[in-house]
Amino acid sequence: MATVVREALPEIPEHIHIIAATDKINTYDLIEIADLGLAYTTTVGMETAMNGIPVICCGHTHYRGRGFTIDPNTWDEYFVALEQVLSDLPAHRLNEEQTAKAWNYAYRFFFEYPRPFPWRLMNFWDDLEVWPVGKVLSEEGISQFGDTFKFLVGEPFTWKD
């Protein structure tokens, strides 16, 4: 992913650091030393909350509003939340119930939720050769990916055994 970001943004401000999968430090190392997480859409915010660290969600990520993040709706609310948390970090650590909610949500997200999808970001062109659009929209493709596509366009999702 770091390669994708560097290709899209060849000039990055000096205060922004991209951590590649091959770097000696990783996001989990950063979580260990963090007092606060600021998340937009990645799972890092959820994983930070799993460690009892408060997380302010800036975007509309899937775990927003699940009871273990701070969810401002405006920029003014964001800066108020940021000031409140930074003024008393220990008081804003997640309690046991909030941390358990983060763990429960993460388990369901990583192990129960994954749905079949024909293309992945990292191997998109290879996947596209195996699953060209016409094949995905064929009877075979719809039988394999139809429920996923219905969910992605907002139809109610039915869990199957």
Predicted ranges, named:
Residues 1-23:
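Catalytic donor nucleotide-activated moiety binding site of glycosyltransferases and closely related
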Residues 3, 46, 76-80:
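Feature representing long, continuous alpha-helical segments
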Residues 10, 39-42, 49, 83-90:
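Hydrophobic alpha-helix feature that most strongly marks membrane-spanning transmembrane helices
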Residues 23-70:
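A donor-sugar binding/catalytic signature common to diverse glycosyltransferases
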Residues 76-161:
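C-terminal amphipathic helix plus adjacent low-complexity
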